[in-house]
């Protein structure tokens, strides 16, 4: 479950605090939310609107748990239960839930814990740029960047010797030599470089979502 940041409308860096156990933020230029979800393997008829808290409940439950224990779901609502079951959210908890939205010419996706979208960055860049920022539960961070269908670079902010591909400074103009966590520094860089701001309240509300196992 995410915790609300102090400033809920500023840029992207709040994501690192709100999803403090682990997160993935993915950005695809020129895509709609549904196009992004289909681009990472979702079938259109299996996309379901979910809030952040509902997605967390579905990820953290055990298969043996009764669906009546889900706070967001009325178990008497057979249509809602059927949509979640057909979408792969029930009865077995999925490995990843990807929730997608749109902002200023980009589609974005958020994952709690997982990094399913990271495998599809090149495909998501077919109309321009695509980026993926991931922080693992162990605290390791990685950024992937692709341009027009081609992977450009994959790096850990602040650790240039771990780069695969073009150096981050050459590919994106990003350097990091401060005390701030690398993923936070890169999120702030994206705010400034691309002018992207995702309101926290929007990400808490229902967004098109897909489950992956």
Task: Please report, for each region that a protein language model flagged, where it lies by residue.
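Long, compositionally biased intrinsically disordered terminal regions
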Residues: 2-12, 136-213
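Hydrophobic alpha-helical segments that drive targeting, anchoring, or assembly
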Residues: 4-160
């Amino acid at each position: 479950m995410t915790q609300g940041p102090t400033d809920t409308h500023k840029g992207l860096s709040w994501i690192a605090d709100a999803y403090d156990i682990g997160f993935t933020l993915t950005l695809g230029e020129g895509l709609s939310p549904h196009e992004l979800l289909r681009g990472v393997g979702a079938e259109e008829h299996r996309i379901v609107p979910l809030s952040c808290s509902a997605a967390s409940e579905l990820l953290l439950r055990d298969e043996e748990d009764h669906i009546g224990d889900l706070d967001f779901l009325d178990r008497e609502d057979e249509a809602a239960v059927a949509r979640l079951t057909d979408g792969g959210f029930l009865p077995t908890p999925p490995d990843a839930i990807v929730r997608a939205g749109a902002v200023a010419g980009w589609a974005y996706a958020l994952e709690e814990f997982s990094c399913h979208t990271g495998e599809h960055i090149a495909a998501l860049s077919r109309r321009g740029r695509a980026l993926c920022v991931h922080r693992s539960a162990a605290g390791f961070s990685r950024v992937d960047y692709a341009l027009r269908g081609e992977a450009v670079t994959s790096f850990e902010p602040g650790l240039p010797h771990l780069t695969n591909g073009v150096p981050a400074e050459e590919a994106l103009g990003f350097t990091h030599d401060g005390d701030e966590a690398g993923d936070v520094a890169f999120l702030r860089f994206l705010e400034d470089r691309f002018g992207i701001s995702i309101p926290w309240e929007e990400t808490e509300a229902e967004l098109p979502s897909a489950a992956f196992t």
